[in-house]
Amino acid sequence: MRKIILLLFVMPLFLISCDKTIKSEKGAIDIISNVYFNASKGLTDHKQFYISKINYVNDDIIELVPNIQAPEFIDSVYYIKDTLFYQPKAFEEAKSIIFKEEQVTGSPKSIYKKRFGAVWVNIPIFDYEKRKDIADTVLYNNKSYKRFEINTPDNYSVYYVHPTDTIIPYSLNPIADKAYKGRLERIDSYDKKKDLFSTIWLIHRQQMDKEAVDIFQFNRDLAEKVSKTASK
């Protein structure tokens, strides 16, 4: 009887440990899109868009939004904390952004209302209920992906979810992430009427952008100065 009770106690713990996730403390996320025009005639007529460079340290996020025409230049910088974003700033102004000051004096808005750079969503993918699971695949760097497709009269899309227990502070669609126990990292979509093929990539990396590193370092240095002054 004791063995049965012990087994009943251990099993839930085992199931919980299997579902345990790991929160990434530091890193960067690139959101990149490729658009192919007149896709049925080939994939030579295309353009790449660098949508966003998301850099994070714990719950503090610095999003660099590149210029559409010249992605090596930064158009605007967002400070994001948890589920709130603050007024975007020009890059030169953002170099001296003070996180604590933004949190106290800023006018934050829900990240789900953000419309430039990376877009946060908390709703299902359009026509998600029509999805059909298809064969798993392996792409670049030997990464495995679970896949599902959505086929409608106007569009055909394939979604790629990489199985992982590591949580990062941005998701192309958290509902799909949860359902397929991973991270949605790629979406291929073909607009049948416009003959337009597009793909969007989420690329997670450990190394942060120097521009963001400098902003985080500025805030760390400032916090140390305040702490030393307070201790005197």
Give the positions of each predicted feature.
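Sec-dependent signal peptide recognition
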Residues: R2-F9
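Exposed boundary/loop context
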Residues: V10-M11, A135
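C-terminal motif of bacterial Sec signal peptides marking the signal peptidase cleavage site
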Residues: F14-S17
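Bacterial signal peptide processing site
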Residues: D19-T21
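Extended soluble regions of mature proteins
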Residues: S24-K232
